[in-house]
Amino acid sequence: MSSIILLAETGSDITKELAQDLNVRLVPMHVTLGDVTLDDGSFPAEDVHSYYERTGKTPTTSGSTPYDFESVLEEIFSQDPNAQVLYLAYSAVTTCSYHSCELAIEEKPYANQVRLVDTKHVSVGQGAVVIATAKWLREHPEATLEEAAAKAVEIADQTKMCFIPKNLDYLRAGGRCSNAVALVGNLLNLHPCIEIIDGRLIAGKKYRGAMSKLASALLREFSEKHGLKKDHIYFIHTPYMEEAIRTVLDAEAKALGYKTVTWMKTGCVITCHGGPGAFGIVGSV
């Protein structure tokens, strides 16, 4: 096994069990519900919806702090002063986490043993980069930290992600679209496809109709647009996704020739933005 330890935020939506298996250390991001701020992953993502139902407000999210990184890094280097750490960051344009890590390692004796890579992805998009890098390290245990960082950049560039919210209520409540836009969108049953482009969440084509009906069209179009490889595809979902969507996407993936399908549930951070019932796609070119 490679001696390189991977670091990522909980916003990557990698489970604790998978992180342990892949030699990945998770740094908490944060979710604020009213006057209370909690670590992402310390409570069920379903609670995000419960809070919105009670208050009409979406919880706010925040990145990992320098202290969060210092806590994890101090533990790593106290156990092994010669450790090497590759931090595969949540999109740096969407959160402070990347800069927090920079601050955390400033003037530390282990600063030269830590490399930072902005994956320019969020949620399972970031998670897919972390997983692929971890598997590459298992196949290349002799790789240097610089080689691993370069490979992670390559993997991140090849990773494509999009998701579709069930409705616009959470985007409206979070200030990401106006009341009028949300009202019209919900009345017309419109669902914007949010694609992660250069680290930013960009609204693209609007699909109309039931989520289970548009799922197959989105998969076909997203696959063709990017020429996704057929060896593996991830489907992601927030809490309370309709089971019919899973059935449709599994069948369409099989019809399109995808060899392996992995479903991953999002945590609290992306659920705050996408709301319940959302689903998405992560693939590689």
Q: Where in the sequence are the language-model features?
A:
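N-terminal glycine-rich phosphate/adenylate-binding segment common to multiple enzyme folds
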Residues: 68-101
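N-terminal glycine-rich anion-binding loop in soluble enzyme alpha/beta folds
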Residues: 5-68
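Short beta-strand/turn micro-motifs composed of small residues
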Residues: 8, 89, 237
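Short gly/ser-rich anion-binding loops that grip negatively charged ligand groups
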Residues: 59-66, 87-94, 119-123
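Short N-terminal secondary-structure initiator segments
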Residues: 43-78, 128-148
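Short Asp/Glu-rich motifs
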Residues: 38, 71, 204
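Mixed-charge interfacial surface used for oligomerization/domain docking
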Residues: 3, 12-32, 84, 94-97, ...
